[in-house]
């Protein structure tokens, strides 16, 4: 794998290097003492980054430094949009958004008409939490370890719609996937409508068994909203295989995309039931673009 192949994993966006063990080691045993990639490879990657000498940045989970080729592409794109003005905004913009959404859908294995580009994971997840057709007395399940902003959004939904939020606590050292699945299962009641679950818990790095949680929830008629803020670009994500109803993520973290890029996946059969944040015109109820209007 050379530098250009690495960067072209998703157009001009550089996927974070934690994906490399999956591509270089295959099914072989992993060891911290085994060198799998040469120093020349890493120096080649490093040369694409402008790194501040004052410190070593180890926090890609908040904001990942953009590689130079991506930054230059972004700057050139901004100049082009400014040069073309309203002509671009009224014409080419829509095709570019559609094509980018389609490529993202290919990256995570979902249908292009089930994915919209948003500004980040928080916006994506809030669109579902606030747009869900809640009725007073409905229940939602989430974990104490979930991202604080999302827990606050559920509190707001509780005040606004009269829903009940049920908190579970994910153990730091679970004995099995089944223990975690059972944790959520035991919190379900006939009033439960939605489970909110982190694909990767940001404070521990724990990857939860989303596929198993979704299968259990669907057997009980409960939908699942997944917070994937720390997953895209960090490891391979197959949304179709996970079987979730909704999936929101940021792309400025492990995918090293510019700030202001995220996406929301909504299962085709669920699109029509979600209320948009801002009203859109000339859209069919099952058109996911209906949820993407920002003015």
Each model region followed by its residue ranges:
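Pyridoxal 5′-phosphate
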Residues: 2-295
């Amino acid at each position: 794998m050379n530098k250009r192949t690495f960067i072209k994993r998703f157009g001009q966006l550089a996927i974070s290097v934690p994906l490399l063990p999956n591509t270089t080691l295959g099914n072989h045993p992993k060891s911290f003492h085994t060198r799998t990639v040469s120093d020349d490879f890493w120096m080649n990657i490093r040369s694409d980054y402008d790194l501040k000498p004052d410190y070593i940045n180890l926090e890609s989970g908040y904001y990942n430094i953009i590689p130079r080729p991506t930054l230059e592409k972004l700057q050139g794109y901004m100049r082009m949009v400014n040069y073309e003005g309203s002509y671009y905004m009224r014409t080419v913009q829509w095709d570019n958004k559609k094509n980018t959404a389609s490529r993202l859908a290919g990256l995570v294995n979902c249908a292009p008409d089930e994915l919209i580009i948003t500004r980040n994971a928080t916006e994506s997840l809030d669109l579902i939490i606030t747009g869900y057709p809640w009725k007073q007395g409905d229940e939602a399940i989430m974990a104490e370890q979930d991202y604080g902003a999302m827990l606050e959004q559920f509190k707001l939904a509780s005040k606004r719609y009269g829903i009940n939020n049920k908190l579970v606590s994910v153990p730091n050292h679970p004995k099995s996937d089944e223990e975690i699945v059972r944790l959520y299962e035991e919190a379900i009641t006939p009033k439960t409508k939605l489970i909110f679950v982190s694909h990767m818990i940001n404070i521990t790095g724990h990857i939860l068994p989303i596929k198993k949680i979704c299968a259990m929830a669907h057997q009980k008629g409960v939908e699942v909203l997944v917070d994937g803020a720390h997953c895209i670009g960090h490891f391979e994500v197959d949304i179709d295989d996970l079987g979730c109803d909704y999936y929101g993520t940021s792309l400025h973290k492990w995918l090293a995309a510019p700030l202001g890029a995220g996406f929301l996946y909504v299962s085709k059969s669920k699109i029509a039931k979600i209320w948009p944040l801002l009203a859109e015109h000339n859209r069919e109820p099952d058109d996911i673009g209906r949820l993407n209007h920002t003015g």
